[in-house]
C-alpha cells in the first residue's frame, strides 16, 4: 500500500518538454472529453460560491477553464510534479480565484478533511497502479460531489496494463506508464461501501476524428466504425472512457 500511496508518475525532469507540450495542447486545442466535463459539471458549479479541488492538476488547465463557469468559486490545484505546478501558476497568473501547490493527493486528508465542496480527478485513475487509495482520499476531503474520468469495462474484470515507451527517457529504463481499465461494477461496489449516496456514469463517445500519432508514441487517435461511431485508441489500448459523478 505504501508503494501505491507514493507512486511517482513523472520521473524528475525526464521527458519534461514532451509532457509540457502535451498539456499545452489541452489549452490551444480543447479536447472533446474536456468539453463533456464542462457540460456535466456546469449545473453543479455555475454562479455558485464553492471550494473546488483539482487533484493531480497537471498544468491546471481544467481549473483554468472551469473558473470561467464559476468565477465566485475558489480553485485549489495540487500535483506532485514541481515543473507542472510552475507552469500552472504561469497559466493562471491573472486568475485570482485559483491557487496551486506541489503536493501529493494522499497527504491532503489530514490537512483538508471535508474541506472541498467539489473535487475533480481528471484523466488520472487509469494511470495509477490502482484506484482504491485515491478514491478514499478524495472522499475524505470532499463534501458533496466528485467528478472523475477513467477507462472502465462494464464486466467484472480489471485489466492491469503497463506501457513501456522505449523512445522516451523513462522508457529506456523501465515501464513508464499505466493504462489500466477497471471493472465498473467493482468500482461501484467499492465506492458505495465507502459511503457514497449515488454514482452516475456517462460514456464518452467522441464525435471528431483524431489523427494517429507516430507509431513509437502513445497518444489518442480514432478509428471510424461502420455505424459512424468512433473507437478511441492509444497504442494497442482501446480507450473506454467513462465520466463519473459521485454524490456524497
Segments (PLM) and residue ranges:
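Class I SAM-dependent methyltransferase SAM/SAH-binding core
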Residues: 61-107
